[in-house]
Amino acid sequence: MSEYKFETLQLHVGQEQPDPASDARAVPIYATTSYVFRSSEHAAARFGLADAGNIYGRLTNSTQGVFEERIAALEGGVAGLALASGAAAITNTIQALAKSGEHIVAQKTIYGGSANLLAHTLPLYGINTTFVNIHDLEEVTAAIQPNTKAIYIETLGNPNSDIPDIDALAEIAHAHGLPLVIDNTFGTPFLIRPIEHGADIVIHSATKFIGGHGTTLGGIIIDGGTFDWAKSGKYPWISEPNPSYHGVRFTDAAGKAAFATYIRAILLRDTGACISPFVAFLLLQGTETLSLRLERHAENTKKVLEYLVHHPLVEKVYHPSLEDHPDHALYEKYFPNGGGSIFTFDIKGGKEEAFRFIDGLKIFSLLANVADVKSLVIHPATTTHSQLTESELEQAGIHQNTIRLSIGTEHIDDIIADLENGFAAV
């Protein structure tokens, strides 16, 4: 279906015809743990990866399969792997690329959970990370070590929406035989397709814009099919016989989808962060309206920014669409259709003023999620990024007077009026 536009693909990929078992137009929920094999030889072929298809519910499910195929198509990748959460997608990706004694180069200004994983949890397993100013390409290059296994970035940094130069970073990664891994949760494939700019692996917390309604946890890894694992020589568990799967070479068994297949067959098999069929079904419902919601999110965000930049109680607004943002040129390059409905601003004063503003809101919900159709607010320094030290907070561009907004799809007049409620409480 590659000849169709995004808005059509988000509705039809993976189920171009009604369900063959029932003629249902909607994707059914296949609530089963396991699948009947036609014969012993058929079972052996499935387990040997010689025959594609369902093996066991922890690894695959037909509802899950439609979701994976659809998001992979929207991103321009060759395969998808859906998991129980965005955190699971990030963790499985890093663990598939780096083993004990190895190293990652990562953007400083990323989601607090990802930063904590890389800075504190993975070092316990022997995987260390150097955090870099992603805009300083010399610093990025200098951070690469002989044991480095990936460069990790976000299309829109969390929470300040800083933007990396994906093309330039892909060139650096590939020159060193490394894949470029990018979290596109805030970008979404509707606004930007990182694989077209050189990224090799794309990650989403599907909990956010893909699901879109604050009902469902999920994550997905998209294999771009662009990285030559055999040529690199740095990932023998993918390109050489793998003893954990009776000597299979995933580059031979799965071709361009070797990375996604390795995670499914080994890491998902062994660690079990599987997605349920019902969750996959809910995420498909969100996917069907992704473009419509993103257009409204962007429209409302533009008007909120116009309001905030002129408000006397606002010290600074951090959004790359603004000309004074250091990444404005990159925003125009990579986001020609707009975007970035999650951003921060600094209120005049400190933590107390920020708290009063937040507590004075009525429509905005104070919670840790983002990218919901409902408008959301939080104080990052004491919540989502509270595990970071003061130095790490400063590196991430988060202050005690920083407030994060996630602009929803309510009527813009009501959103602006509620922001007035917050400022009135200060």
Q: What do the PLM-derived regions correspond to, one by one?
A:
Residues 271-274, 278-280, 285, 289, ...:
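Conserved small-domain helix->loop->beta segment predominantly found in fold-type I
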Residues 39-91, 113-121:
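Conserved N-terminal alpha-helix of the aminotransferase class I/II PLP-enzyme fold
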Residues 78, 119, 128, 146, ...:
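PLP-dependent enzyme catalytic core of the Aspartate aminotransferase-like
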Residues 2-61, 69-70:
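N-terminal "arm"/small-domain region of PLP-dependent enzymes with the aminotransferase-like
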Residues 2, 14, 18, 81-310:
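Conserved PLP-enzyme active-site core in the AAT-like
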Residues 222, 344-346, 406-408:
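Short hydrophobic/aromatic beta-strand micro-patches
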Residues 156, 185-187, 322, 348, ...:
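Active-site beta-loop-alpha junctions enriched in small/polar residues
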